[in-house]
Each structure stands twice: as C-alpha cells, then as structure tokens.
C-alpha cells in the first residue's frame, strides 16, 4: 500500500496498466475485451488509466469515482479532506504535492484523445464523493475527447457512497 500513496500514487496507475498489458501480451485477451472497474478511490484509478492508456481498455466503469481529487483535497472544510492528507499529501502546504496531484487527477488531465467507453455512476446522496465530481468529469470528457466516444453518466437518486441503504429500498 505504501508504494502506491502520496508521492508514489502513480505506481497504482502504471501497475494496473501493466497488468492489462500483460494479459494481452500473453494472449489471454485483447484490449477491446478488457473492462476496468473501480469505485471511490478506485474510481480515481479508472479515470487515471483512461487518461494514461485509453487504448488498453475497451471500457471503464467508474463507480462514485473520486475524479476531481485536486479540487476536493484542496478544501479542508469537506468532511474527509484533512484525514485523507495522510494518503494523498497536503497540497495546501506543499507545492510539490499540489503539482504531483495535478499531474494525475483525472479531471485535470482529460485531453483530446480517443477514450474507451466510459460509464460513470454517481449517487445523489454521496457525502464522500459529491455527485458533481463525476458529473463535471463526464461533461469534460464529452467536450474534449476526440473520436466517437461513448461516455455515460448514471445518477443513483436514492443512494449514498456505498449504494442504496435500507431506508431507500422499495
């Protein structure tokens, strides 16, 4: 875990991409048949690998994805920001952390390239990753990506960070 946090966070992304490339190289599959899936901080991973190696995946499913990490971690008034500095670093006090996070934060790094198909799932009542993060990420992908990319956003209207709770069930 320590080799993939703070100023080593990019190891998480390169390791994930290397695993997908290994499956292809050894003949187990083809890139267009690989669908990557992750939620919350794993959703950040999904956004980062979509930016870094879009041709390595046929699709990406990002559930309650932490894709606007830099903006969120810069706001100490949010419930989890200060305790998350142990994982990500504190970009308010360390310019190197700020620049490092900016270099991988999915929202900041959307570019004019072809992306795999992307499904982002957010929850209206999520108090950890506010629904606006994936919504603005999807909007930026749609506005910026080149080619004919499918980027979908599903908003769970009665769910939180961990999905639907008992009080919302039918």
Region locations from a protein language model:
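Active-site-proximal cap/loop segments of hydrolase catalytic domains
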Residues: 1-170
């Amino acid at each position: 875990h320590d080799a993939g946090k703070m100023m080593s966070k990019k190891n998480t992304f390169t390791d994930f991409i290397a695993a997908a490339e290994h499956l292809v190289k050894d003949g187990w599959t083809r890139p267009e048949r690989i669908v990557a899936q992750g939620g919350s901080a794993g959703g950040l991973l999904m956004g980062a690998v979509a930016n870094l190696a879009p041709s390595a995946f046929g699709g990406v499913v990002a559930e309650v994805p932490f894709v606007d990490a830099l903006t969120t971690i810069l706001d100490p008034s949010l419930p989890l920001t200060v305790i998350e500095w142990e994982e990500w670093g504190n970009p308010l006090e360390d310019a190197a952390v700020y620049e490092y996070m900016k270099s991988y934060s999915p929202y900041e790094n959307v570019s004019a390239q072809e992306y795999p198909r992307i499904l982002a799932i957010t929850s209206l009542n999520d108090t950890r990753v506010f629904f606006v993060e994936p919504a603005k990420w999807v909007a930026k992908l749609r506005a910026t990506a080149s080619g004919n990319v499918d980027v979908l956003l599903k908003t769970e209207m009665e769910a939180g960070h961990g999905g639907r709770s008992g009080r919302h069930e039918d």
